[in-house]
Amino acid sequence: MNELEQNSASTITISLCMIVKNEAATIERCLRSVASATDEIIIVDTGSTDQTKELVRQFTDKIYDFPWIDDFAAARNAAFSHASQEYILWLDADDVLLPNDLQKLLLLKQNADGTVDAYTMNYNVSFDEGGNVVSTLGRNRLVKRSKNFQWIGPVHEYLEVGGKVNSTDISVTHKKENYDTCDRNLTIYENRLAKGEDFSPRDLYYYANELNDHQRYEKAIEYYQKALDTQLCWVEDNISACGKMADCYSALNDDQNKLKYTYLSFSYDTPRAEFCCRLGYHFLGLKKYQQAIFWYTLAINLQKPKDPLAMLNNACWTWLPHIQLCVCYSNIGEIQLAIEHNKIAESYIPNHPSILHNNSYFAQVLSSSS
C-alpha cells in the first residue's frame, strides 16, 4: 500500500437499502447474513401482505411504505433517499452474503479507501447440482451516498455510477427459491409499449429477454435485432444478445442462423469462451472432432474479459472445454491427450459423474492395452 492509500484508508459506515414485497420466505435469511456489517438497515416495502414487515422489525425500525407504480428504479431510489451513512449497500431479499464474503465485507469496511465512489462485487446467479457457481456477473454494489447515484429504468434497472470505481472479490449469492415464469416484467414492458413509449437500446434488449423467457422466440429475435441495430448497447449486452438469438434459433431448429449469431459475437470483442464452447459443441454433435478440438482449445487459451461487470459462465472458462476435449481426443484415438484433459477437468470438479466415469473407462482402456 502506498502512502496516499494509507492516508485514505479508514473505517466507513454502511446503510443497507432494500426494496421488498411479500418476501417472508427469504428476508430473514438475507438480513441475518449481512446485518453485522451494516450500521443502518433501510427497508422500502411496496405492498407486502405477508409477514415481511414483522420479520424485518427484528433488524430495523426504518421501514417505509412506497406505492408500487411499476417502476423498480423509483422504489430503489426511494430506499436510497432514506440512507444516512457514508456508503450504501443494496441487496434483494433472495440474496445472501456467505460467511466468507461477510468477513471480506467487514475487512473492507475497516480498511476502505474513502476516495472510492463505488465498489463492485461479484453476483453469483446460478449453480450446478454440486453447488458450484456456474454464472457470475459484477454489480456496482457499495456506493458513496454523497454522490447521489441514481437507479435508471422501470424494470431491469441499473445503478448509474461514475468517478472512482474499485473492484472487490466479495460475492453476493443469489438464492432464489422458486424459478417461476412471472409475467410481471413482461407486462410492464408491454404496458409501456401500449402507451407509445420509445424504448432505449437497453429496454429493447431486456424486453427481448422477457420474450425469450416466455418462449416467444420470433418476437424475441425481432427485438434483439432492434437492440443490436441501434449500435448503442453496452458491449456485454451486444454479446449476450448474440448468444440469446442463437438460443432462439436453436429452439426454432434453425442451425444456420444459430451459427450466424454465434460467430457475430466475435465482432464485438475478442472471442469469449462461452461462444467457443457453443461452436465446439456444435461440431462435436456432427462428429467433426478436429473442428470441435479447435474451438475448445481456443476456449482454454482465452483471457477473461477485463470488465468487472461482464457476465461469465464459469464452466466455460474452467472445466467444460477440458472435459469436451477429453471426449474429442478419445474419439480420434488420442487416449493420452484425452486422459490429460480429463485430469485438468478433474482438478476443478473432482466428484463430477463424468469425471468418475471417464477415470473408470480409461483405467479399463489402459489395462486392456497393457
Q: Where do the language-model regions lie?
A:
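N-proximal low-complexity "stem/linker" segments adjacent to membrane-targeting elements
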Residues: 1-33
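Catalytic-site signature of metal-activated, phosphate-bearing donor transferases
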Residues: 2-5, 13, 74-80, 86, ...
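Acidic helix N-cap motif at the loop->helix transition within catalytic regions
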Residues: 25-28, 50-59, 100
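A conserved acidic beta->alpha catalytic loop
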Residues: 33, 37, 45-55, 68, ...
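Conserved donor nucleotide-binding strand/loop of the catalytic core
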Residues: 54-82
